[in-house]
Amino acid sequence: LNIEFWICGICNSDDYKIELKNKVRTDNVIFDFRFINNGEIPSLLSKVDIVLIPYNVESSLNSGVAILAFSYAKTVISTEIGTVLDFLDSGMVYVYNNSQNDELKNTLCSIYDEIQKDSHFLEVKGSGMLEYVRKHNNVDFIKKELAKVYL
């Protein structure tokens, strides 16, 4: 199985860029430390199978990136932020606690094992999540759910 990891997006500091690069001891990690324009997102998402969102849970609640990844039928692994936790009952997203070092590694290994058993595993997960989002973010569905709470 040929795996590449892409680390994309703006870094807060040059020190953080250097720290990330120093931690990598393999040639299959690609760094792209720049702002990703909206026009580039479809092309970038078409090249990946999984979107890993390692947000700081103390400063992030929601993620447009997660919703966008779901919209492109991509499997998402994320820290425990509100957006992703809202979709946890779908059984199609992966959530990890970023204070537990082995939790992300274990999640990645678990996904790798599933891919070994079924090469279409990620497509099935991604497509399932896309359908889940379409159903649960449907205007009529949301109206009904809000009516249950407020009426």
Question: Which stretches of residues belong to each language-model region?
Answer:
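A charged, aromatic-enriched C-terminal amphipathic alpha-helix characteristic of glycosyltransferases
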Residues: 99, 116-150
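Acidic, amphipathic alpha-helical patches
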Residues: 38-41, 65, 84, 104
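Nucleotide-sugar-dependent
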Residues: 53-67, 80-81, 85-86
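Short alpha-helical donor nucleotide-sugar binding micro-motif in glycosyltransferases
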Residues: 43-48
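Short hydrophobic beta-strand element within catalytic cores of glycosyltransferases
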Residues: 75-78
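Nucleotide-activated donor-binding/catalytic signature segment of Leloir-type glycosyltransferases, i.e.
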Residues: 9, 17-42
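Short alpha-helix at the nucleotide-sugar/activated-sugar donor binding site of glycosyltransferases
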Residues: 69-71
